Amino acid sequence: MSTKEDRTTHYQEGSLTLPGTVMLGTGVMIGAGIFALTGQMAQMTGALFPLAFLAAAVIVSFSAYSYIKISNAYPSAGGIGMYLHKAYGNQLPTAFNALLMYFSMVIAQSFLARTFGSYTMQLFGGDDSGRMVPILGVALILVAFVINLLGNRLIQGVASSIGILKIAGILIFGLVGIWISGSVSIDFPEPSKAGAPASFLGATALGILAFKGFTTITNSGSEVIDPKRNIGRAIVISIAACVLIYTLVGFAVASNLSLAEIIETQDYSLAAAARPALGEYGVWFTIAIAMMATAGGILASIFAVSRMLAMLTEMKLVPHRHFGMPGSIQKHTLVYTVILGLILTAFFDLSRIAALGIVFYLIMDIAIHWGVLR
């Protein structure tokens, strides 16, 4: 196979429908936000964590406007990379900020993988050794890698099926949890006992990570049907769906667990919240939904981030070596993305991964808005 072919990108135009694109976006968003971040945010801001989710939603809604306007004008598989290129040209700021987004997305992918392991191990009484969580996360990434190799139709079909089951299951959990608890309640702390405003802002920043999955939609621009219309619509639908689901489930968790219990079970707080509300069957149901949600998130994240890196390489913003691998550059970046995700999943814990990811994302997000304003 020629070197030229090795360094060529191949996109399946018109292979993603609007519902399929929405499912890819919500796959990342719902997987990270509900199952991985609820306990982390509660630890930072106390009983006010559902309000931190809402504050993050407001900020992201304003932020999404810039992405929608740019994606309508420049739909591309490069997504963020292409937008930065339009704003800053073929210069260092474009490559630097695009790579921050790339690493942020890979970190989110690893975050989801370890969350998958944490929930799965609750079926077996937890992971006292600490070994099985990363092993299960690594296995999930490898399965998602194989599915991504098999083409967009399969990715869309799997993501859509998982998305429908996941959203239905989470809504059932939220509604039943609130119904059994008898009310939607938060124990608002006294001002003297409330967390510092800085803690609430920190939790809100972490909550933004729960919504940033909408940016993965922008990386599908070359493959979405009628991209100038459907990318913006998919972003709006994804954010609206996540606001509804996050709010509902946040209040359900707060109504069934004390703050101390949420923090103690922060890596699997939804499963813990299901026990008092629904018993052991509810725990198993919630774990199954969590496994589907995080698996769908991994699938969508790998799909989006590998395409963005391929576009950056095509624009000659980052160097590329194919190391003798056959196929298009898109397949090569898929391999590199998976290898990096495997390393992060195996050696970093949830809190470190989340903190690093949000810093990278926020720096890149500021650059996007500054570029639009220029």
Identify the residue ranges that each predicted region occupies.
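Membrane-interface "cap" regions at the ends of multi-pass membrane proteins
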Residues: M1-L48, S61, Y65, F188-P191
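Helix-loop-helix junctions that connect adjacent transmembrane segments
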Residues: T3-Q12, P50, D127-I135, S160-V283
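Hydrophobic alpha-helical transmembrane segments
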Residues: V22-M23, F49-L54, A95, P134-A139, ...
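Hydrophobic transmembrane alpha-helices that form the core helical bundles
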Residues: Q40-Q43, A52, F62-I141, F145-L149, ...
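Juxtamembrane helix-boundary/capping and inter-helix hinge elements in multi-pass membrane proteins
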Residues: M44-A47, Y74-A77, K86-P93, S222-N230, ...
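Generic alpha-helical transmembrane segments of integral inner-membrane proteins
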Residues: L54, V58-F62, L99, F103-V106, ...
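TM-loop-TM module centered on a large, flexible mid-protein loop between adjacent transmembrane helices
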Residues: M82-N90, Q122-G126, V236-L299, L317-L350
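C-terminal membrane-solvent junction of multi-pass transporters and transport-like membrane proteins
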Residues: A194, G324-K331, D365-R374
